[in-house]
């Protein structure tokens, strides 16, 4: 609307999980109508005029699009690019980069790879019949352009874990004062909840004995130690010795201690920049969650 488009299609919020209904269709439609009819964006020649943010991004988008079109023309045009698979390859490169950013949480998708709702039930996806186009195009020999959703991997993992009948409780062994464990406990909670795991986060423990006792009583499938790097030097060997047969995770990645901590019995590390999908998928498999729920 702000850009002056002649037509616009906005997807329904539930288009992946249900057939079209009046409520979702109305919401998708009315967002743009409100901008036009109530905010009167269509009455102004250039609503975004003077906005460096919008104008700069618009110019950058136009420049990159024009550069890409020239590149396609130099290689024989868009039809040839489709037939040769160039466009498919370019889309795959962008998709892989976006997936990598999502997996390492450089790109945040609220409610999915960060701040996931632990009480949310996964929606039931349905197969919605679509009308097929009888027109056969020569270009389709190259294969259809893929429809990709960046968060699909982690959504599938989360659904798999939630639907599984395996124990998915993770007990946080918060050690020391609240200043010692709070940051990493919050990080660990968000990390595990993104994969559908249930987090048990008690108050801090001042002794290893108390932490081990509570951990055993929690009946959790795995335990995650949360504290400072300095305290880990004493805590990790002691906790690993007290829980030799347990799946122990460490919140953090002290590079100079990783190998020795592994020897002590730490099975997994979670930290900023870790691949959340790969890490949680490995955890799910270790806990017995099957690939297909």
Tell me the role of every PLM-derived stretch:
Residues 6, 67-170:
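Intrinsic disorder at enzyme termini
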Residues 37, 164, 169-225, 235-242:
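Generic long, charged, amphipathic alpha-helical segments
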């Amino acid at each position: 609307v702000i850009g002056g488009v002649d037509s616009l299609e906005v997807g329904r919020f539930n288009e992946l999980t249900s057939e079209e209904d009046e409520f979702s269709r109305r919401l998708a439609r009315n967002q743009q109508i409100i901008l036009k009819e109530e905010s009167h964006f269509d009455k102004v020649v250039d609503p975004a005029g003077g906005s460096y943010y919008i104008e700069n991004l618009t110019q950058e988008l136009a420049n990159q699009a024009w550069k890409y079109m020239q590149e396609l023309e130099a290689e024989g045009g868009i039809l040839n690019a489709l037939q040769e698979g160039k466009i498919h390859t370019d889309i795959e490169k962008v998709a892989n980069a976006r997936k990598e950013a999502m997996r390492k949480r450089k790109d945040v998708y609220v409610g999915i790879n960060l701040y996931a709702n632990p009480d949310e039930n996964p929606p039931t996806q349905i197969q919605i019949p679509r009308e097929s186009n009888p027109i056969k195009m020569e270009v389709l020999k190259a294969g259809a352009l893929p429809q990709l959703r960046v968060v699909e991997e982690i959504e599938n993992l989360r659904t798999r874990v939630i639907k599984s009948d395996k124990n998915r409780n993770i007990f946080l062994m918060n050690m020391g004062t609240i200043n010692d464990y709070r940051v990493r406990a919050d990080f660990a909670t968000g990390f595990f909840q993104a994969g559908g795991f249930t987090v048990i986060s008690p108050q801090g423990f001042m002794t290893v004995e108390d932490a081990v006792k509570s951990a055993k009583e929690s009946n959790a499938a795995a335990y995650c130690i949360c504290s400072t790097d300095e305290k880990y030097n004493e805590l990790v060997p002691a906790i690993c010795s007290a829980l030799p047969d347990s799946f122990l995770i460490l919140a953090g990645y002290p590079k100079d201690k990783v190998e020795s901590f592994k020897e002590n019995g730490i099975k997994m590390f979670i930290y900023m920049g870790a691949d959340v999908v790969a890490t949680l998928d490995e955890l799910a498999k270790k806990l017995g969650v099957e690939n297909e729920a």
